[in-house]
């Protein structure tokens, strides 16, 4: 899979920064984002994107990849899609290790197909667990149909 250097750099930066504030105190994340209603676990991505933007980051695709990496975004380019997949397929996760390992091995050969599968798996898990399905997630799924 050939990736232009500029895009490759965005993928690396997204992977490096997307969870930078994952363990930050919730009051700090709410202060950064101004968000008083979203679930705690969804605040770190937007907070990182806001901080990066304040520090001068101008690559909107990178900022959007990080901002929406927990819920998805139908308007993502390859950077957002790659981060969404990587976040789900990361080897350190305990669930469905074999299935995720197989999917990860297929990314270079079938990027869009694997992305669709990851979105489907994440959506199915949310439904099965009785979690709220965010509008961004629904819009992402519908954009892939």
Region locations from a protein language model:
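Charged phosphate-binding loop/patch that engages nucleotide di/tri-phosphates or the phosphate backbone
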Residues: 124-145
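Amphipathic, Lys/Arg-enriched alpha-helical patches that create a basic surface
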Residues: 114-124
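Divalent metal-dependent catalytic cores for phosphoryl transfer on phosphate-bearing substrates
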Residues: 1-116
